[in-house]
């Protein structure tokens, strides 16, 4: 499971999920990517389940990059505890995902295999996603 090794503060505010992703919106490492279409918290267990689903399908072929990391602690109070008496203890770690963020990347497999692997990963995640391909930036810009 993905968790931070050490953190400056054990507990965090929930924060807002307004707006689109600032960075990480293009396919950088692989050939294909899985892009978020809506904002959500994605837990470390969901990330791991999606990774396993993809790697099982591609069967040792290709490489998978995980572009999100669960660095936000989410606290929870125990069951049947009265209100008040402080904030609960950290229960799980989540990654804040905003629309446009590339969450996973894949390379070294044919497009139809990548598409199916990403489709299996989408079912493990709590948000709508879309399959994207790497956009080659014009290579003839410096010639002339």
Curated annotation (Swiss-Prot):
At the highest ranks, the source species' classification is:
Bacteria, Bacillati, Bacillota, Bacilli, Bacillales
Question: Subunit composition?
Answer: Part of the 50S ribosomal subunit.
List GO BP terms, alphabetically: translation
Cysteine disulfide links: none
Task: Tell me what organism the protein belongs to.
Answer: Brevibacillus brevis (strain 47 / JCM 6285 / NBRC 100599)
Similarity section: Belongs to the universal ribosomal protein uL16 family.
Transmembrane parts of this sequence: none
Tell me, what is one Gene Ontology molecular-function annotation carried by this entry? structural constituent of ribosome
Q: Can you say what this protein is called? A: Large ribosomal subunit protein uL16
Listed A to Z, the keywords are: Ribonucleoprotein, Ribosomal protein, RNA-binding, rRNA-binding, tRNA-binding
Top-rank taxon: Bacteria
Q: What does this protein do?
A: Binds 23S rRNA and is also seen to make contacts with the A and possibly P site tRNAs.
Q: Does the keyword tRNA-binding apply?
A: yes
Q: Which PROSITE patterns match?
A: RIBOSOMAL_L16_1, RIBOSOMAL_L16_2
Q: Among the entry's GO cellular component annotations, what is one? A: cytosolic large ribosomal subunit
Disordered: annotated segments: 1-22
Task: Say if the entry is tagged with keyword Phosphoprotein.
Answer: no
* NCBIfam families according to UniProt: rplP_bact
Please state the gene responsible for encoding this protein.
rplP
Q: Where is the composition biased (Basic residues)?
A: 1-16
InterPro entries per UniProt: Ribosomal_uL16, Ribosomal_uL16_bact-type, Ribosomal_uL16_CS, Ribosomal_uL16_dom, Ribosomal_uL16_sf
């Amino acid at each position: 499971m993905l968790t931070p090794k050490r953190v400056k503060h054990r507990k965090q505010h929930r924060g807002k999920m307004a707006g689109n992703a600032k960075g990480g919106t293009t396919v950088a490492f692989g050939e294909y990517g899985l892009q978020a279409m809506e904002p959500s918290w994605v837990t470390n267990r969901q990330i791991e389940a999606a990774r396993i689903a993809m790697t099982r399908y591609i069967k040792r072929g290709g490489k998978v990059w995980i572009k999100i990391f669960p660095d936000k602690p989410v606290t929870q109070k125990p069951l049947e505890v009265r209100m008040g008496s402080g904030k609960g203890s950290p229960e799980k770690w989540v990654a804040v995902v905003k629309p446009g963020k590339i969450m996973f990347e894949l390379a070294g497999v044919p497009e139809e295999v990548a598409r199916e692997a990403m489709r299996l990963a989408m079912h493990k995640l709590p948000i709508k996603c879309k399959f994207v391909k790497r956009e080659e930036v014009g290579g003839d810009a410096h010639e002339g």
